[in-house]
Amino acid sequence: MTGEEAVVVTAVVAPKAGREEEQPPPPAGLGCGARGEPGRGPLEHGQQWKKFLYCEPHKRIKEVLEEERHIKRDECHIKNPAAVALEGIWSIKRNLPVGGLKPGLPSRNSLLPQAKYYSRHGGLRR
């Protein structure tokens, strides 16, 4: 194999009907009873071990699958992506003077636009 990892998986399968041959014992340490799993005893008579070879997919295929998984995850987490993106750029709370008006009759001068000066170093100034 060219740099890919392979794993040998063993499984127990029952033989087809009509076969009465003696099967070799399973490799040491791979049987269900050898691992000490609860509720599993040693192999019954007539069962045989089958080996399967697992090869990992190519690196590019794994990258594409991971990208798709991230895209799906991001779609689920962001409810309103436009509002989230816009909040970092422009916010009503930061950019407009809201509040500060006292209940009752406001003065006529407070309703007029106030002179504001913009400095790229200091932001908005009055």
Curated annotation (Swiss-Prot):
Q: Which organism is it from?
A: Homo sapiens
| Alphabetized UniProt keyword annotations | Cell projection, Cytoplasm, Cytoskeleton
Keyword check for Cytoplasm, yes or no: yes
Q: What is the protein named?
A: Uncharacterized protein C11orf97
- Mainly localized where? cytoplasm
Gene Ontology CC annotations of this record: ciliary basal body; ciliary base; cytoplasm
Question: What is the superkingdom listed in this entry's lineage?
Answer: Eukaryota
Tell where it localizes: Cytoplasm, Cytoskeleton, Cilium basal body
Xref: InterPro entries: C11orf97-like (IPR040429)
Q: Where is this region: Disordered?
A: 13-45
